[in-house]
Amino acid sequence: MDATIQAAAARLSRRLKKNGKTVTLAESCTGGLLASTMTDIAGASAWFQRSFVTYANEAKIEELGVDPEELASKGAVSAQVAIQMAQGALRRANADFAISVTGIAGPSNQGSKKPVGTVYVGIASRTWANAKRTQIGGTREENKSGFVHFALLTAMDCWNKAFDRMVEEREQMAHEAEVARLKLEMEAKRATELENQQEGHEAKAASWQDEAWESNGDEEEIGLEVEWVDSEE
């Protein structure tokens, strides 16, 4: 196996192991070569779950649940089928991610309108799925190796972007939470200010009442100031 392919597989395995994630595979044109490449790495059982080799269309339908109408209209070598293969493998396996490979290794395209060397790689998780296409020119063996390399690179690229999206979503959620917290603080502060203002008004009114009725110790002896008239005069 080419050293660059081995390096790509090792890089992917480290990423999976570091994050405690597992992967499952669904292969067509590579016939298990991707699974072989990944399980050549010692300790693969920690992150490699299982693999499906669905070479025939019937196998794609039976094993992975690929839509027969999609196969008929789009062809086995298409983005739609690549995504459905990955999603089907994910449903069948207790894994976090799935990689699928479907293409035309050659030497002929067997009547397909797509040229030899065309490949689609599907990547799926529980929350997202994507597919990428490329074309590799070479012998059947070279194409299969190239497909494996492209699948590994695509997986890393998609998962890096997914990680970036996850970070952005977390940052957005944190920002929204901070905005909500500040809003609640402002509302609470405003409510306290209004309450204090109300208490101030009530205190002022009570003070006026005290002044109106307070005698300040100088009691008025009204009876002494009244001239009483004798009714008998």
Language-model features: where?
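Short alpha-helical segments enriched in small residues
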Residues: 1-233
